[in-house]
Amino acid sequence: MPATAYERVVYKSPSEYHYMKVCLEFQEHGVGLNVAQFKQLLVSALRDLFGEVGAALPVDVLTYDEKTLSAILRICSSGLVKLWSSLTLFGAYKSKKCAFRVIQVSPFLLALSGNSREQVLD
């Protein structure tokens, strides 16, 4: 019986940035945030989990919709896991329970323009 050799291959993305489509959901309806408050919420989530080092990560809000509380974020690829984990563990804003939903993540901004799961074929 021949021995099987396995090789571990790790792919490191050459992209400098990753893009995230996220949505903030509150348990109560009627909570509104402007883009500055939303950005501060992101920085607070990073600070809560990773301290000042996390808060210093460069996160850009490329688009923001105040009605749906959804945004497209740009983060340096090295900070993607930190941002994602801090958003996952974030749970309250001004004593109101909330949760971030990560809808899509891609190293390509164009990939976030559509969702194949919602595509309607004729």
Swiss-Prot record:
One Pfam family of this chain: RNase_P_Rpp14
Role, per record: Component of ribonuclease P, a ribonucleoprotein complex that generates mature tRNA molecules by cleaving their 5'-ends.
Intracellular or extracellular location(s): Nucleus, Nucleolus
GO CC aspect terms: multimeric ribonuclease P complex; nucleolus
Superkingdom of this protein's organism: Eukaryota
Protein name: Ribonuclease P protein subunit p14
PANTHER family: RIBONUCLEASE P PROTEIN SUBUNIT P14
Subunit structure: RNase P consists of a catalytic RNA moiety and about 10 protein subunits; POP1, POP4, POP5, POP7, RPP14, RPP21, RPP25, RPP30, RPP38 and RPP40. Within the RNase P complex, POP1, POP7 and RPP25 form the 'finger' subcomplex, POP5, RPP14, RPP40 and homodimeric RPP30 form the 'palm' subcomplex, and RPP21, POP4 and RPP38 form the 'wrist' subcomplex. All subunits of the RNase P complex interact with the catalytic RNA.
InterPro entries recorded: Pop5/Rpp14/Rnp2-like, Rnp2-like_sf
Keyword tRNA-binding: no
Family note: Belongs to the eukaryotic/archaeal RNase P protein component 2 family.
Any one GO MF annotation of this record: ribonuclease P activity
Location (main, coarse): nucleus
Biological processes annotated in GO: tRNA 5'-leader removal
